[in-house]
A protein has these predicted regions:
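Positively charged n-region of N-terminal signal peptides that target proteins for export
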Residues: 1-4
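Aromatic- and Gly/Pro-enriched helix-to-coil junctions and flexible linker segments
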Residues: 14-162
Length: 162
């Protein structure tokens, strides 16, 4: 009986959150990774994400309008550099457009394949190749221009009388 009690006590201590192995802290980003974020990733987030995950609205307590807030995450971690397969952000971005949790939402313009490739490379911890960065940026500029045009059209449209 005493052995069983000792075994049970040892098992409880081993399973306790106080003895559980803590996750490794994220490694600091390199200067090149910060530059990739600033030049390629942040503009993509501005075009596709910040309207719901920015200073005016924080869905899921997640903000993607600065590098620091992006790395901090929201209710869940956004991603860990070098671990793309465990990234909540990537899993949502790469979902089929028919899925319920796809990001950006179905009502918004989705990221292009080049933008997704650039985001994946960044989260993977790899440099974003120049050609991919240029293609992703061109797609981002087109998305921003389309959003600006749509906003101007909506503002100029006559308001319906009640």
């Amino acid at each position: 009986m005493r052995v069983l009690l000792l075994f049970s006590a040892a098992t409880l201590v081993a399973a306790s959150p106080f003895t559980a192995k803590k996750p490794e802290p994220a490694k600091p980003l390199t200067a090149a990774q910060k530059a990739d974020f600033t030049k390629v990733i942040q503009p993509m987030f501005d075009a596709h994400c910040v309207s719901c995950h920015g200073p005016k609205k924080e869905k899921g307590k997640l903000r993607l309008d600065t590098l620091e807030l992006t790395l901090k995450g929201g209710k869940n971690p956004t991603f860990v550099i070098g671990k793309p397969d465990s990234s909540m952000l990537l899993s949502r971005v790469f979902l089929e457009r028919t899925a319920g949790d796809v990001m950006p939402p179905k009502s918004e313009k989705p990221m292009t394949e080049k933008q997704k490739e650039a985001l994946y490379a960044f989260v993977e911890g790899q440099p974003i190749p120049d050609e991919l960065a240029k293609a992703a940026l061109a797609d981002t500029k087109a998305a921003l221009a389309a959003a600006k045009t749509a906003a101007a059209d909506a503002k100029a449209a006559p308001k319906a009388k009640k």
